[in-house]
């Protein structure tokens, strides 16, 4: 996923994209001005109504049309990965350019129509067929952290299942969303004659979200975002598939290979400056493993900051609010060098991640901070590590990671934390099929229990029974 682009390559990509933004191919300052024939609408109600028409057209095209739409989205996303990744990086100003590009290049791994196969049973009393049928129009909320990747992944899953979709993207990534959705729709219309299969609000607001959620044209909602938007979706009155917040803990014990554990944690936690919801957010290491493990962190691209620097950074990142801590957004997804300067330190431009020793109640441990600064908590033993990890995970039931060669300990942590995603002896990204087995998705429905989404997530099971006939034996 990491392209290892050098600084000159990064500058060239950004310069090229900014030039296009300033020229005839630029995204407009008000995305709603895009032609509605490209699926971009000024409000939620009109976008939902148009998507309903797009759904009707898709139904006429059958599974072949679904398959072609999936192929269009995958091929366009991969072929435009450098330009679109740079566009999103320039718009959102968070994460790492090479990882923005990488997230788009791997969209081809998202499962499509091949996942939608019926189940059939035959017996003395006839036959039964169960099919995975579409809902119709799905309303989708997408985050600023992964604007185009989440949109592309959602489209692939949802259209493969036979649905249309209307997006209310995060305002911070709306230009990227509009650019990609407009391009997809143009190619879908050119090749299939289907219009408005993928719709989007060009000026997304709370009001446009509410209009989508309340629209009679929308059957279900799919939410990828923080606790606030998930809570709102739960009150919409519609079935909601919610990919909520996480704060993934890591346990490293004395049986683990310290170098491999350090390298894996850096690979997962530093990816896109730790914007991934599955990314390693806090580490609990046993006393017996601590020295060797932290030495390997330093040897492999992470840099330790002092307690004084940590205090200064903490004051920049968090504010006390309602008896707890609230995250200030200014440093979310920023490079470790930016974080170091905020902490009053200077570090190598090659540094991938910062780390600091903290106690288990430090705000960097308890709050999901989404930046490449990982707190390391030294604990007496594995039992203490599990208790602390469970507290830090906050019952989000999202993701957790362990580095250990003790299978009993792996099992204990998995049972206690009860997360949707649990990775053993690998980077967090292995949980989505990147260096591990399985399939890719950018929406992990933790809050509502569907898990890592795939086309079947967006279907309803329908049963058809024939009594006394058609069983041919």
Question: Predicted regions: what is each one?
Answer:
Residues 2-129, 157, 299:
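N-terminal Rossmann-like NAD(P)+-binding subdomain of aldehyde/semialdehyde dehydrogenases
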Residues 2-35, 126-136, 336, 423, ...:
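Terminal low-complexity tails and localization/encapsulation signals of metabolic enzymes
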Residues 18-25, 52-62, 73-81, 85-88, ...:
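Structural signal for hydrophobic packing residues in well-ordered secondary-structure cores
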Residues 38, 152, 230-353, 359-360:
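ALDH superfamily catalytic-core signature
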Residues 63-67, 192-198, 271-277, 303-313, ...:
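Flexible, glycine/charged-enriched surface loops at secondary-structure junctions
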Residues 118-260:
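Rossmann-like NAD(P) dinucleotide-binding subdomain of oxidoreductase/dehydrogenase enzymes
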Residues 345-473:
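Conserved C-terminal structural/oligomerization subdomain of aldehyde/semialdehyde dehydrogenase
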